[in-house]
């Protein structure tokens, strides 16, 4: 089995090395004969040293000039040669336990893909409440967080990848399409819960409660209009790092 690990990255020089180290450590601890992998970092038009740091760490670097996370993930998938695709965000860290669970799911042959619960350190009460609400929703509806989504490469290509009309929440649409694809073939799409993915809480540190909750409310009240307009998604796209 050959696994392609794809990391979209826009101005991630502070965190990309940490992310890549977590991946190489997880790969090393879960090595087994017959398993191969590749790591692809998609430089999503960065203006910092992200691409050079990724190359120095041994990753293949692909350039995507249009700053859009779904488009960046698709660009990485277009270069991938794996039977399975693992998308993980540059501000997240894989852990060996989670990676082992992913490999077991792949070996089991009963799933089209999976997502994972996530953990963030140092959240204020309102942000932790928001996270817990999302986690409950994710598990109930089997919607993957964008921070980590894993799927068969043939399924990904059959459903058309990430929706490039959306600038955020495209992982929910992909989760739904993968569930449908899998259901037709007797396969499931699940959310792993034993070893949560560690992801950064920088949005909470960089944006006020008013900014974050306002962004969430706009998405809830006017989802299509908001998610298709990059200018209305400042928490994702204004470049604060």
Q: Where are the regions a protein language model picked out?
A:
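Conserved donor NDP-sugar-binding/catalytic core segment of glycosyltransferases
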Residues: 96-126
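A conserved acidic beta->alpha catalytic loop
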Residues: 22, 43-51, 92
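Short aromatic/hydrophobic "clamp" motif used to bind/position activated sugar donors
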Residues: 85
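Glycine-rich, basic loop-to-helix element that forms the pyrophosphate-binding segment
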Residues: 64-80
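Short, well-formed alpha-helical segments that are part of the catalytic scaffolds
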Residues: 12-31
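A short, conserved alpha-helix in the catalytic core of glycosyltransferases
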Residues: 155-160, 165-186
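Acidic helix N-cap motif at the loop->helix transition within catalytic regions
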Residues: 14-18, 47-57
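Cell-envelope/extracellular polymer assembly enzymes that use nucleotide-activated donors
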Residues: 2-4, 38, 173
